[in-house]
Amino acid sequence: MKDERGHAGIELALAVAVLMIPAAIAVLGFGPWSERSVLAGAAAAESARAAVIALSTTTGDQVAAEMSLNYGLDPTEMRLGWCGAEPATGGAGTCPMSRGATVEVTVEVWVPVITTPWGEIGGVWVSRSHAESIDLYRSLG
């Protein structure tokens, strides 16, 4: 009978390097994507509502900036676009602040593609929009 020696050590090392490490990186990358995607939607809804109540997009900008800071994001990692303006170009659209008007905001949040313990690699902008109507019977004075 021949002496058969196994290759379990080599197979284990290859399995960890080829299968486990990429799977772990994929799982770790899902958390920030999910968190920041939810942040974009919530920031869009809250900032649009704040702008409608205060009749000012500046108030909406402040609400979104505060939410960004609460999540520990750099201010450059979130951008807003009001009433059709592109967030990437400054986002200062003109929103009509009259009864029955619709105020729309688009929020973009930077999401890293891969998150490792040593830092983030790559990234994409996740975008969410929300529209809020100004009440027809509200006092504007």
State what each model feature region is.
Residues M1-A65:
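Alpha-helical assembly-interface signal, strongest on the long, hydrophobic N-terminal helix that forms
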Residues I53-G141:
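Short, conserved structural patches
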